Amino acid sequence: ARPYSFGL
């Protein structure tokens, strides 16, 4: 769960 939603 990251504050940015990228598939990284």
Curated annotation (Swiss-Prot):
Presence of keyword Secreted: yes
**What GO terms describe the biological role, i.e. biological process, of this protein?**
neuropeptide signaling pathway
Modified-residue entries (Leucine amide), positions: 8
Tissue expression from the record: In larvae, expressed in the CNS and midgut but not in the ring gland, thoracic perisymapthetic organs (tPSO) or abdominal perisymapthetic organs (aPSO) (at protein level). In adults, expressed in the corpora cardiaca, corpora allata, brain and the thoracic-abdominal ganglion (at protein level).
Subcellular location per UniProt equals: Secreted
Principal localization reads secreted
A cellular component term from Gene Ontology for this protein is: extracellular region
Keywords associated with the record:
Amidation, Neuropeptide, Secreted
Asked if the record carries the keyword Secreted, the reply is yes
- Tell me the superkingdom of the source: Eukaryota
Q: What does this protein do?
A: May act as a neurotransmitter or neuromodulator.
Q: Which family does it belong to?
A: Belongs to the allatostatin family.
The name under which this protein is listed is Allatostatin-A1
Q: Which organism is it from?
A: Delia radicum (Cabbage root fly)
